[in-house]
Amino acid sequence: MQLEKMITEGSNAASAEIDRVSTLEMCRIINDEDKTVPLAVERVLPDIAAAIDVIHAQVSGGGRLIYLGAGTSGRLGILDASECPPTYGVKPGLVVGLIAGGEYAIQHAVEGAEDSREGGINDLKNIGLTAQDVVVGIAASGRTPYVIAGLEYARQLGCRTVGISCNPGSAVSTTAEFAITPVVGAEVVTGSSRMKAGTAQKLVLNMLSTGLMIKSGKVFGNLMVDVVATNEKLHVRQVNIVKNATGCNAEQAEAALIACERNCKTAIVMVLKNLDAAEAKKRLDQHGGFIRQVLDKE
């Protein structure tokens, strides 16, 4: 696909004279364009749901969720991956973000990194990619060689693959087994795909990881019951989670958390089933960590 023919490289009539308007009008133009992004994502919800189901199946079987991207797309993958351990208590290696050019590229532009097919393949080799893993290639344009080569390599290994781009029929979309293509149109600043396209990608990644964690029992109701208390804010959040899930008071919630070494799931089952920490943990283990199953089946 030629660059000049891509939707993400098109000229946006709504912002054609944005350099001549007031600062407030400038903000309104950008905001009006941003409002279209959730609608574009809404149109591909069935594709996102299909990807979540596949990711969950693979991760449940011992696989990992691997994000692969360059520039903004790569940084968004790293952002999503890095938030999973503290939010959901998973091991850091379960959700992995890879960016063309390596760690240096997180904060700096690395010339030519996105054009390196070898880079995409080697980065996947270096993390020991296996057929159990799911590789999600992220590229607004859908033409990034680093991502395309990585997806091709992953498919050769037998991995399930997902391609996220904002141009229909792109190489990323056709290379991956599952395509998620929120078409957000031309950017306010022509070609600046960190804007609407980046926002769409972030929304999709939010759904992929959150959907995976919900289906993995990491959420009870709408509470993040595997949150790790790494700071005072999260310490308080744990107490509030136990309170909201059980109806107990703050003192009871804190006492239960202390008794089970600050594991929200165990504390919730302790309070709701009137159990000690050891028995609550045992029952959770018997039901794969799903609070709902412990409550419904016992």
From Swiss-Prot:
One GO BP: amino sugar catabolic process
Keywords: Carbohydrate metabolism, Lyase
Domain of life, per lineage: Bacteria
Gene3D superfamilies, per the entry: 1.10.8.1080, Glucose-6-phosphate isomerase like protein, domain 1
Reactions accelerated catalytically: N-acetyl-D-muramate 6-phosphate + H2O = N-acetyl-D-glucosamine 6-phosphate + (R)-lactate
Cysteine disulfide links: none
Triggers of expression: Induced by MurNAc 6-phosphate that releases the repressor MurR from the DNA. Repressed by MurR in the absence of MurNAc 6-phosphate.
Active site: 83, 114
InterPro entries: Etherase_MurQ, Glucokinase_regulatory_CS, MURQ/GCKR, SIS_dom, SIS_dom_sf
PANTHER family given in the database record: GLUCOKINASE REGULATORY PROTEIN
Family statement drawn from the similarity comment of this UniProt entry: Belongs to the GCKR-like family. MurNAc-6-P etherase subfamily.
Assembly notes: Homodimer.
Additional comment: A lyase-type mechanism (elimination/hydration) is suggested for the cleavage of the lactyl ether bond of MurNAc 6-phosphate, with the formation of an alpha,beta-unsaturated aldehyde intermediate with (E)-stereochemistry, followed by the syn addition of water to give product.
Record-linked HAMAP family: MurQ (MF_00068)
Protein name according to UniProt: N-acetylmuramic acid 6-phosphate etherase
Gene that encodes it: murQ
